[in-house]
Design a protein with these regions (language model features):
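Soluble FAD-dependent oxygen oxidases
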Residues: 1-436
Length: 436
């Protein structure tokens, strides 16, 4: 291994670290603290040339490479080869006239929002703008206004990718369409993506936000939501409902600290008056919220709809796609995750899909989830610190219990960006790509 280390340190401008060195643990850390990676070599690329050099050196030595961007993805434990981090490739260049952005592999959606929104342009980002752009796009991307505009990867123009032999290639619908098909939804394994060029929307505001309801109201909120999405909801409206068990932390608003709540999440593209009319039947059948607002929202603040966690933690996660969500599904969810259940589950979310999520993609892609009516996302975290593997096993069992509860309504597949550690344990669930 001495030879490959020497070659990497001579060719790469970023840190090349081994387990005994300072900075190694911080370099390989991801968002899920339960993922205890221990690669013999960690390489941090600070330029695209670093990626090319690392891939070529690893290929010559027969060393496998695992790539981590911002670290939010669910990656099996890495114990061999090279862990290559791209989080320092953070360049974002916006072309206002072309309505496009070139985004480095380490940049987050926050960085794109910061540059694009002052010009009245909007990237089709996810619910958590702190997530890396490239990893999100490689899985498709189901965001807060996705029923209107589709998967985020539908708006990718091209990728720059370093292939297994070290060749740097620009891939688009016109140049290498087969690889472009695979990269939009296939998630990984085709090379190291160093940047993506994405289309931007001409959109400066939306109508949206999140409202929270007390534990006692959770059954009524879920039942009202089910009836609402079973009605004729236009594609301009994207919603979800979540059962949240929130920690008692000072960073949370006082009404929510330590509480079990339901949250209604709304993203609407159009006039506020139209949105109010659409939501009126739902609001008329649920109690008053205890916190939160839904109204006109600058696109730069789209992350406040979900307010997803930004602090790394040890957690167990899973997703599943449903072909329907009816009154019996609601009852099944309440039985395993309702306010009466003592559980380590932090979130059980039901997302309304359909609309532009159903495709078809043009050009074709490998995105999983087109055609599903709903998506379920589940995450749990042991409350005690330090991290206890036994507690994580209990948490994973609770997450699996939700998957089992909704199995009668499942398509049998998972949207790949929502394929979590519980999905992949022991073989996991199917992730289905579209026919090519």
């Amino acid at each position: 291994m001495h030879d490959i280390l020497a070659s990497l340190r001579a060719a790469v401008g970023g840190p090349v670290l081994t387990p005994e060195q300072d900075g190694y643990r911080a370099e390989i850390a991801g968002f899920d603290l339960a993922q205890d990676h221990r690669p013999p070599i960690a390489v941090s690329a600070v330029t695209v040339r670093d990626v090319v050099a690392t891939v070529r050196i690893a290929a010559a030595a027969g060393f496998p490479i695992t790539v981590i961007g911002d670290g939010h993805g669910d990656i099996p434990r890495v114990t061999d080869g090279i862990l290559l981090t791209t989080r320092r490739l953070t360049d974002v260049r916006v072309d206002i006239a072309d309505r496009s952005a070139v985004v480095g592999a380490g940049a987050t959606w926050h960085a794109v929002l910061d540059v694009a929104t002052p010009a009245g342009l909007a990237p089709l980002c996810g619910s958590a703008p702190a997530v890396g752009v490239v990893g999100y796009l490689l899985g498709g991307g189901m965001g807060p206004i996705g029923r209107t505009f589709g998967f985020s990867s539908d708006h990718v123009r091209s990728f720059d990718i370093v292939l297994a032999d070290g060749e740097l290639r620009t891939v688009s619908a016109e140049r290498d369409p087969d690889l472009f098909w695979a990269l939009r939804g296939g998630k990984g394994g085709f090379g190291v993506v160093t940047s993506a060029t994405v289309e931007l929307l001409e959109l400066s505001t939306i109508y949206g936000g999140g409202q929270f309801y007390p534990a006692a109201a959770i059954p009524a909120v879920l039942r009202a939501y089910q009836r609402f999405v079973d009605s004729d909801v236009p594609d301009s409206l994207t919603t979800s409902v979540a059962i949240l068990r929130l920690p008692d932390l000072p960073m949370l608003p006082p009404p929510l600290r330590g509480q079990t709540v339901a949250q209604l999440r709304v993203g609407f593209v159009g006039a506020a008056a139209e949105a109010e009319d659409l939501l009126a039947p739902l609001r008329a059948t649920v109690p008053a919220p205890i916190f939160g607002t839904i109204g006109e929202l600058p696109y730069a603040e789209i992350g406040t709809i979900h307010n997803d966690p930004t602090v790394p933690s040890a957690h167990a996660t899973a997703g599943i796609l449903l072909d329907r969500f009816d009154a019996d599904t609601v009852q099944a969810v309440l039985a395993v995750a309702g306010p009466q259940v003592a559980t380590p589950l932090g979130i059980v979310e039901i997302r309304h899909l359909g609309g532009a999520f159903t495709g078809p993609a043009s050009p074709p892609d490998a995105v999983s989830g087109r055609g599903a009516a709903f998506g379920v996302w589940v995450s749990g975290a042991p409350m005690q610190l330090p991290f206890d593997p036994n507690a994580m096993s209990h948490t994973a069992a609770a997450v699996r219990g939700v998957l089992d509860a909704v199995a009668p309504w499942s398509t049998g597949a998972v949207q790949i960006n929502f394929c979590g550690s519980v999905n992949t344990a022991g073989g996991g669930r199917r992730v289905v790509a579209r026919d090519h």
